[in-house]
């Protein structure tokens, strides 16, 4: 495609931290639209490899000379967020040369210009709800452009430049950057306390959602889950401002646009009965909504996606058909594999949950999977994410993890943060009352988990850090154990 489709300052872009979920998506869209892209990252990753295969020039490590990877040099340097150290040599060199340094949200806003924008935000469920919306619109033949914080199972990518006139994106609320956007349709899944390291107070965090809603374009709509107290309160405030609000949830009422009437787990999927407001559907009465992903929270996410899709003209029944084919998002209760142990199998899942509410929802889904299986236990390997979050939610993490039968707590994955005195995985472990092991030695965890597993168990690796690497290691250790106990028996099955 011609670079004429891109603003002049985005035709030759260098991206610092290009392999991350958000940055790699922007890079893909720039490449799809004919731009030249270079970048750097601290380490090799799936995202880095995929972008190289599409023509991006990427260097591991940070060096000022990386700005010259592209012929003619970069016209802009993009960073993930303001937390990138100002001493980063590439940013220092960009400023010395007078090359504009811009943040990812500003670039995404430019890429969405001129399109009907549908944006999903909230404390939990953003990535899954955004992905459901994308898959549903694709099924309806709309071919949306999209940028999402996870990898869609169906597409194997986190971003795409589509031929349609709509753009679907996940709006990150963690640092206020969602205020860069002016959506036509905004979906808010829920609002709970989080990211207090940036906002300083719950009140400030909640206020950013109000400000975001006020940026909805005239004639647009807010889609919000009112099962959540924070969402219900926001819906009321938005209504008072004259914003069109479409509420969804499980509590029926005259103001509800979509209601979850009933829901039943079926294997690793679910069947729900829903009711839509008369103005949203040609045929009245309960409808069946089938999903291939487990958990009541997934059914609510699907309702939000359904309402958003209908707002831009997608027929409700076609959207429901599309949602039935949604296969999930990488690292959202993703089945890593299965291993035969004794007379039953052990299933290993991986999940991105890093907030107490997310943990509770994921463990509820795991319980439902167990009820459909061989009656094993629920084992969790939890890695706290960020020292500030661990300090704020240590007790809540412990209480949420108590829904498991056995818990392995790792040390904190600090990411961008420096350690805080007195804060570690032990801060969480002391609040866990079910059988628990605190294992600060990351290299020792897989063997311990595999040794503790029993036939029929479900194991969930959980957190936003590198705990995701443990799933395959646990499966390998389980296979070795199975082969030792029954020579010649098949090991990992999936």
From Swiss-Prot:
Lineage, top-rank taxon, reads Bacteria
A Pfam family reported for this protein in Swiss-Prot or TrEMBL = Mur_ligase_M
Quick one: which gene encodes this?
murC
Gene3D superfamilies in alphabetical order? Mur ligase, C-terminal domain, Mur-like, catalytic domain, NAD(P)-binding Rossmann-like Domain
What does the entry list as the binding residues for ATP?
A: 122-128
Q: Which InterPro entries is this protein grouped with?
A: Mur-like_cat_sf, Mur_ligase_C, Mur_ligase_C_dom_sf, Mur_ligase_cen, Mur_ligase_N, MurCDEF_pg_biosynth, UDP-N-AcMur_Ala_ligase_MurC
* Pathway connected to this protein: Cell wall biogenesis; peptidoglycan biosynthesis
Family statement: Belongs to the MurCDEF family.
Keyword set, alphabetical order: ATP-binding, Cell cycle, Cell division, Cell shape, Cell wall biogenesis/degradation, Cytoplasm, Ligase, Nucleotide-binding, Peptidoglycan synthesis
**Job of this protein:** Cell wall formation.
Q: What biological process terms from GO does the record include?
A: cell division; cell wall organization; peptidoglycan biosynthetic process; regulation of cell shape
**Molecular function (GO) terms listed?**
ATP binding; UDP-N-acetylmuramate-L-alanine ligase activity
Whose protein is this, by species? Mycobacterium bovis (strain ATCC BAA-935 / AF2122/97)
What would be one Gene Ontology cellular-component term for the protein?
Answer: cytoplasm
Signal peptide (from-to)? none
Q: Which reaction does it catalyse?
A: UDP-N-acetyl-alpha-D-muramate + L-alanine + ATP = UDP-N-acetyl-alpha-D-muramoyl-L-alanine + ADP + phosphate + H(+)
**Enzyme Commission number(s):** 6.3.2.8
Protein name per Swiss-Prot or TrEMBL: UDP-N-acetylmuramate--L-alanine ligase
């Amino acid at each position: 495609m011609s670079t004429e489709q891109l603003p002049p300052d985005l035709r030759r872009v260098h991206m610092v931290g290009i392999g991350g979920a958000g940055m790699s998506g922007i890079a893909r869209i720039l490449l799809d639209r004919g731009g030249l892209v270079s970048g750097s990252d601290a380490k090799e990753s799936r995202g880095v490899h995929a972008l190289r295969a599409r023509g991006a020039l990427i260097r591991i490590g940070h060096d000022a000379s990386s700005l010259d990877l592209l012929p003619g040099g970069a016209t802009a340097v993009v960073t993930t967020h303001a937390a990138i150290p100002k001493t980063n040599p590439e940013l220092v060199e960009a400023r010395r040369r007078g090359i504009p340094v811009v943040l990812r949200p500003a670039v995404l806003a430019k890429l969405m210009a001129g399109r009907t924008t549908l944006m999903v935000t909230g404390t939990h469920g953003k990535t899954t709800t955004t992905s459901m919306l994308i898959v549903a619109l694709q099924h309806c033949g709309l071919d949306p452009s999209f940028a999402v914080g996870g990898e869609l199972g169906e597409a194997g990518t986190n971003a795409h430049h589509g031929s349609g006139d709509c753009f679907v994106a996940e709006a990150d609320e963690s640092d206020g950057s969602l205020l860069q956007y002016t959506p036509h349709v905004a979906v808010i899944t829920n609002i709970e306390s989080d990211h207090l390291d940036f906002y300083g107070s719950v009140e400030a965090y909640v206020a950013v959602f109000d400000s975001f809603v006020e940026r909805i374009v005239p004639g647009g709509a807010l889609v919000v889950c009112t099962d959540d107290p924070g969402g219900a309160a926001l819906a009321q405030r938005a209504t008072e401002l004259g914003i069109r609000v479409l509420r969804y949830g499980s509590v029926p009422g005259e103001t509800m646009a979509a209601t979850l009437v009933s829901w039943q787990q079926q294997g690793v999927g679910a069947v729900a009965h829903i009711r839509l407001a008369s103005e949203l559907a040609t045929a009245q009465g309960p409808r069946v909504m089938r999903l291939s992903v487990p958990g009541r929270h997934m059914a609510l996410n699907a309702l939000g996606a359904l309402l958003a899709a209908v707002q831009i003209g997608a027929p409700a029944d076609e959207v429901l058909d599309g949602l039935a084919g949604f296969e999930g998002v990488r690292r959202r209760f993703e089945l890593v594999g299965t291993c035969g142990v004794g007379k039953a199998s052990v299933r290993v899942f991986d999940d991105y949950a890093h907030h107490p509410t997310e943990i509770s929802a994921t463990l509820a889904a795991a319980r439902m999977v167990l009820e459909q299986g061989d009656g094993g236990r629920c084992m969790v390997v939890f890695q706290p994410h960020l020292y500030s979050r661990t300090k704020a939610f240590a007790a809540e993490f412990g209480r949420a993890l108590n829904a498991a039968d056995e818990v392995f707590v790792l040390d904190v994955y600090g990411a961008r943060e420096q350690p805080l005195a007195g804060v570690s995985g032990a801060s969480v472990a002391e609040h866990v009352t079910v059988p628990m092991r605190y294992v600060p030695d990351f290299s020792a965890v897989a063997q311990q988990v595999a040794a503790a597993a029993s036939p029929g168990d479900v194991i969930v690796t959980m957190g936003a850090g590198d705990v995701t690497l443990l799933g395959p290691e646990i499966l390998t250790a389980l296979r070795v154990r199975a082969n030792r106990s029954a020579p010649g028996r098949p090991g990992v099955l999936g």
